[in-house]
Amino acid sequence: MNLGDRAEIRRSFTASDVAAYVELGGEPPDGRTVPEPMIAALFSYLLGVRLPGPGTNYLKQSLNFTRPAAQAEKLIASVAITRLRPEKALADLETLCRNEAGEEICVGRALVRVKDVDVAGG
């Protein structure tokens, strides 16, 4: 891992996806937008599977949603390493979700504990 490393996922949520979320106990949406926790889950996926990846322990997250995401709207969620603290095995990341038009859906930060922090990157 190095400062500036980045991972992204492209995804859209259908009405069926939202209905399945509501069945799990989520809040019923207004019928047109994607519930914010579904978008936040994209960051959990990226952190646990891609960057830093398996073995990551999610410690903290803050998100600011700036506009709603419409169902079926194509979203691009990304995480980028902004700080490495190898002495504590911690990594700080920027989290960002935009639509295909480049409009910001949400922005935030994440703090994770990782197995192998590159000492040279800190």
Predicted regions located by residue number:
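HotDog/MaoC-like acyl-thioester-processing domains
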Residues: 1-3, 71-74, 78-122
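Hot-dog-fold acyl-thioester-processing enzymes
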Residues: 1-56, 60, 119-122
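Intrinsically disordered, low-complexity segments enriched in polar/charged residues with Gly/Pro
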Residues: 49-56, 68-69, 81-85
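Generic hydrophobic-segment detector
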Residues: 62-63, 92
